[in-house]
Design a protein with these regions (language model features):
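Solvent-exposed interhelical
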Residues: 106-136, 173-190
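Membrane-interfacial alpha-helical segments at the cytosolic side of multi-pass membrane proteins
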Residues: 20-22, 54-60, 108-121, 168-175, ...
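Alpha-helical transmembrane segments of multi-pass integral membrane proteins
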Residues: 6, 166, 170-171, 190-292
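Functionally critical transmembrane alpha-helices in membrane proteins and complexes, commonly lining
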Residues: 1-26, 45-51, 73, 80-83, ...
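Membrane-proximal cytoplasmic C-terminal regulatory module of class A 7TM GPCRs
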Residues: 236-238, 292-321
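Structural signal for the C-terminal ends of transmembrane alpha-helices
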Residues: 21-29, 61-64, 117-123, 171-180, ...
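Transmembrane alpha-helical segments and their boundary/interface "anchor" motifs
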Residues: 26-62, 77, 101-110, 134, ...
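Interfacial loop-to-helix transition and helix-capping segments at the boundaries
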Residues: 1-9, 67-77, 91-104, 146-168, ...
Length: 338
């Protein structure tokens, strides 16, 4: 279960890098520039209300469950999007461990739009080149980390390791452009799915070590064929519903999964039957009464702006919905510790 979750997180990174890059490139080609202010403001409006509310709920629970469940140091790491580096340094985020992947994503989004806006003066090829350079650096770091015997959590939770699938997704989006889904031979797609299944089947410690590389390869081989998926599936109301609420579901699944796994030692099937329904209900409630009302309020910071890529944030969270429920068990990094 945890191996599948680790693979799911890596695939989410790849999907996220692909989608946000495609949206940024589309905005640049439409407007001749990327509205960075709109991008960052809209991300804050989309992400922070639910995150703050979920951390507040965990803090209240921590008052009864004790410091093993919650501390204010954990909350600070989550709110500042430094959770992954807290785990790399050996600290335990307990019920907020799942926020490490949000930290990785936001660190990427802090720098990548700036870089895309600059290098797009040279066209999509320049974006592919820069992303490819980042992938090469990431692979070099990965080989070095394995060679020197770095701990698994140093590889899995680090920004360097997670950059591989993120940049691979970004490079794929820039390379695809207006190319047909058949630009890459379909047999490559089968290799990509094979890598995904292999990662999910391997022992968990092996999976988390090689996940940055295997998921990056899978993203490069599978994503170019995404457009060939049946339209009714991609446009289904159920997928859109889960996509819009997947971020909240992910936030609420994490504390439940940690408590049931680490404290009560529930089996995976018991967690699946309990955590997923509870997360869906709480996530749906959060989206309806916290996120949606906040997003409907006009922001003075977004007046007189060009149409930004961040307007399509629901397209991004739709991708999150493909992995959010399966990824939760793997977020508890200490569960893999000796």
């Amino acid at each position: 279960m945890q191996s599948a979750g680790a693979v799911g997180v890596g695939l989410f990174f790849g999907l996220s890098g692909f989608l946000i890059t495609a949206l940024l490139l589309e905005e640049y080609e439409r407007n001749g520039a990327i509205s960075l202010r709109a991008f960052y403001v809209r991300r804050a409006r989309r992400l922070l209300p639910a995150l703050v509310m979920s951390i507040a709920a965990v803090a209240v629970a921590g008052a009864f469950l004790g410091p093993l469940f919650f501390t204010w140091q954990m909350a600070a790491a989550a709110l500042l999007y430094l959770g992954n580096w807290a785990l790399v340094s050996g600290k335990d985020l307990a019920s907020l461990t799942h926020t490490w992947s949000l930290a990785v994503e936001e660190q990427f989004y802090l720098a990548w739009p700036l870089l895309v806006g600059f290098v797009m003066r040279g066209g999509r090829r320049a974006v592919v080149l820069v992303a490819g350079l980042g992938i090469a650096v990431g692979l070099t770091w990965f080989v070095w980390a394995v060679a020197v015997g770095a701990p698994w959590y140093r590889i899995y939770f680090s920004s360097e390791g997670a950059a591989l699938p993120l940049l691979t997704g970004a490079a794929t989006a820039a390379w695809m452009g207006r190319r047909s889904a058949h630009a890459m031979p379909s047999r490559f797609r089968h290799v990509g799915w094979g890598l995904i299944l292999m990662g999910a089947a391997l022992p968990e410690r092996a999976t988390v070590t090689i996940t940055p590389v295997t998921t990056a390869l899978a993203v490069a081989l599978v994503l170019p064929h995404a457009a060939s998926c049946p339209a009714p599936l991609l446009e289904s109301r159920a997928l859109r519903w889960f996509g819009k609420r997947s971020y909240s579901i992910y936030l609420w699944n994490g504390p439940f999964a940690y408590w049931l796994r680490e404290v009560w030692h529930w089996p995976w099937w018991g967690m699946l039957l309990t955590v997923v329904p509870a997360g869906v209900l709480l996530g749906a409630a959060s989206y309806r009464w916290i996120e949606a009302p906040f997003l409907r309020r006009p922001s003075p910071l977004l007046t007189n702006q060009t149409t930004p890529a961040a307007d399509s944030v629901d397209d991004e969270t739709r991708a999150h919905g493909l992995t959010s429920t399966t990824a939760t068990p793997a977020q508890g990094g200490r569960a893999l510790s000796p």
